[in-house]
């Protein structure tokens, strides 16, 4: 989920230990399989596969599951599905724009899951293009803070194409053009700086500020969407203050 970055970071930590762990693993495995199918089984020559594997490893997905996914995707092992990426657009409560990225082998099932989740949680589906223009495709790398300063991170990635470094509290968010994502990730590695994830995300050009009630409603909608096996990512243009987040987390 991407919208409020601090929420996304908190949610990621919880996801590793909560009841959705198996579902999270399955989605990561699906990403690996598709990356291997489209770009080959060698992570060294397939940056998308490399990042998908790294993300899975950091979430403690077993190595044997990762290896099998790579082999299935590359056609070296039977059992791979024919997945396609589908984007759905809509509006959530309080006019929050929502992009839903699905990776599915059943278009009808995915469409039904998304529509049901939206309509049951105060959302509405929208026509293609009516929401996506509010987002730009960007490279986003999350770096655990540790002993690092913002200047440490900025110095490592500035010449690689990074546009900004944002302090998220316990981590830094490095934003770049999607085409510079690999260069930014490589620059961090060369500088000896570890990172939690490197993804091409849809970043909103403007955000809707939400109060506690609004935050709870949009989080409920996003949880319902992410509960579908076909939904890989949900992007939304909302923001909430630290004070509101503390109330929601309580």
UniProtKB/Swiss-Prot annotation:
Keyword Glycoprotein assigned: no
GO annotations of cellular component type: cytosol
One of the Pfam families matching this protein, by short name: TACO1_YebC_N
Presence of the UniProt keyword Flavoprotein in the record: no
GO BP term, pick one: regulation of DNA-templated transcription
Keywords: Cytoplasm, DNA-binding, Transcription, Transcription regulation
One Gene Ontology MF term: DNA binding
Broad class of the protein's primary localization: cytoplasm
Domain of life per record: Bacteria
Subcellular location: Cytoplasm
Cited PANTHER family: TRANSCRIPTIONAL REGULATORY PROTEIN YEBC-RELATED, TRANSLATIONAL ACTIVATOR OF CYTOCHROME C OXIDASE 1
Family, similarity comment: Belongs to the TACO1 family.
Protein name: Probable transcriptional regulatory protein SAV_6832
């Amino acid at each position: 989920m991407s919208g409020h970055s601090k929420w996304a970071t908190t949610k990621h930590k919880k996801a590793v230990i909560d009841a959705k762990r198996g579902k999270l693993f399955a989605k990561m495995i699906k990403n690996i399989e598709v990356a291997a199918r489209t770009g080959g089984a060698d992570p060294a020559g397939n940056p998308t596969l490399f990042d998908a594997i790294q993300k899975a490893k950091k979430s403690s997905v077993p190595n044997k599951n990762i290896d099998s996914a790579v082999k299935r995707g590359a056609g070296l092992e039977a059992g791979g599905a024919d997945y396609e990426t589908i984007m759905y657009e809509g509006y959530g409560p309080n006019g929050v724009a929502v992009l839903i990225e699905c990776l599915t082998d059943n278009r009808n099932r995915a469409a039904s899951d998304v529509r049901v989740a939206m309509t049951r949680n105060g959302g509405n589906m929208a026509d293609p293009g009516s929401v996506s223009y509010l987002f730009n495709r960007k490279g986003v790398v999350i770096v655990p803070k540790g002993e690092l300063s913002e200047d440490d991170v900025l110095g490592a990635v500035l010449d690689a194409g990074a546009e900004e470094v944002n302090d998220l509290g316990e981590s830094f968010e490095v934003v770049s053009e999607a085409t510079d994502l690999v260069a930014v990730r490589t620059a961090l590695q060369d500088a000896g700086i570890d990172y939690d994830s490197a993804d091409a995300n849809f970043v909103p050009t403007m955000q809707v500020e939400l109060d506690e009630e609004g935050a709870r409603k949009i989080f409920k909608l996003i949880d319902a969407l992410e509960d579908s096996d076909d939904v890989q990512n949900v992007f939304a243009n909302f923001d909430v203050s630290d004070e509101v987040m503390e109330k929601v987390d309580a």
